[in-house]
Regions:
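ABC family nucleotide-binding domain
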Residues: 1-214
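Conserved switch/coupling elements of ABC/ABC-like ATPase nucleotide-binding domains
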Residues: 215-221
Length: 222
């Protein structure tokens, strides 16, 4: 996956705010890349565009050598549901549903029958260490457990790419380290590509590459 000349502007107060300013980036299959930079520099915007949650003002994203945004709205929805998993700083779990029901949801939205997705969801929750917590609602789980549910949910439709926006930002250092260990294990065992926006330098250093954003562009790579 790659970005070429990405520009993203937002209308604000009768004017325009430029967030991305001609950003170029390559993301190779199977690698784990950290995006770092000050708040407001465009990290979340970049992830939203890579995940087809938002469109660039100019520029293009190539996925399998095809221009992603040449797809129809239905094609973009299919891409989001089948090819990409999302993990956010705040887990965005549905509070009225159990952990298991939250993990099942992407499969149901993808058109699968509950009987076909239930076993897969249970296996994912067991994999992330929540075998005994499947029937608990989010309010009955710790912050680290909630994020584990969110990771299981992101894996439900077997994505090639996971976009994680500050996935450890709301956790203490111990829980953050455990969550990163889990993401790394998934990356290595399943070959899932990760693009992770983070302020945590210690976690970023454990990834394959780090890219630093300044003024809406990639300013440095390590």
């Amino acid at each position: 996956m790659s970005a070429r000349g990405l520009v993203k502007n937002y209308a604000m107060g009768g004017g325009e705010v430029r967030v991305l300013r001609g950003l170029d980036m390559e993301l190779n299959a199977g690698e784990m890349v950290a995006i770092m930079g000050a708040s407001g520099v465009g990290k979340s915007t970049l992830l939203h565009i890579f995940g087809a949650l938002d469109r660039p003002t100019r520029g293009e994203v190539l996925y399998r050598e095809e221009s992603l945004f040449s797809r129809s709205d239905a094609g973009l929805a299919q891409f989001r549901n089948r090819s990409v998993g999302f993990v956010f700083q705040f887990h965005h779990l549905l509070p009225e549903f159990s952990a298991l029901e939250n993990v099942i949801m992407p499969g149901l939205l993808g058109g699968e029958a509950r009987r076909d997705v239930g076993g897969r969801a249970e296996a994912l929750l067991e994999r992330v260490g929540l075998k005994e917590r499947m029937e608990h609602r989010p309010s009955e789980l710790s912050g680290g457990e909630q994020q584990r549910v969110a990771i299981a949910r992101a894996l439900m439709n077997r994505p090639e790419l996971i976009l994680a926006d500050e996935p450890t930002g709301n956790l203490d250092s111990g829980a953050a380290g455990l969550i990163f260990d889990l993401l790394r294990e998934i990356n290595r065992s399943d070959g899932v590509t990760f693009l992770v926006a983070t302020h945590n330098a210690a976690i970023a250093e454990r990834m394959d590459r780090q890219a630093v954003m300044v003024d809406g562009r990639i300013a440095a790579k390590f």
